[in-house]
C-alpha cells in the first residue's frame, strides 16, 4: 500500500504539516530557528517553546516576504516537521504550498531540497491562494468530505483571496481555479509591522526592547486584539490605570523575563 502523500503548508510565520485526507494539520511549528546569545545550541521550529527565557534570542527565518532565502535553514525545519509526523520521505509524495509570486529560481531551490535532500517520490506545487479558493468553493457546495481532490472540477466562481502574512499582505483574484496574475497586488504590511509598532511603543514609554522580537510577538498574541468598536474601546481605556486604582476592562499585566 502506497504511503499517503504529505501536505506541507509552508508559511513565513508557521509551517503546518499533515497528510492527504486530514481535516487539520498534524503538526504546527514556527518556521524559524533560534539561538540564545552566547550559546552554540540552535533551536529548530517547535524547540523554541522548550525554553522559558525568550530574551536575547537570535532568530533566523528561511522565508522573507514569502520567498525562500535560506535553503539550509528551511531544510532543518522541514526535517524536524517530517520526523514529528512520521513521514517517510523516500516512500511518499508531497504537496507544498508556495507564494503566488514565487520566482522560478526559488521554485527550483525548493525542488532541490525536496528531491535531493529528502528524496521524495514526487512533488505537487500549489499556490496558497488556490488552496483557499478551492476550500471555499467546496464549502459553498456543501462538500465537507476531506480527501476528494485538491481543486473541485469546473470551478466557475470568482474569489478574492486576501493573505495577511508575517511581512506582507497579498491580494489574489482567482477565476475558474486560476490566479489572475495581472490583478495580484501586494503591500509590505503584515504581522511583523504590528510587532514593530508594539516594540516602538514599549521601547519609547517603558523599556528598551528593540532586540526582543520573540518576546514582543508573544506579548502581542496574548494581549492584543482587533477591536470591533474602536471608539468605545479607546474610551474605556482612557485614564484607567492600575496606579489610579481604576483599571479598565482591557487592562492587563505582563511580566517580562
Can you describe what each PLM-predicted range is?
Residues 1-257:
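C-terminal region/appendage detector
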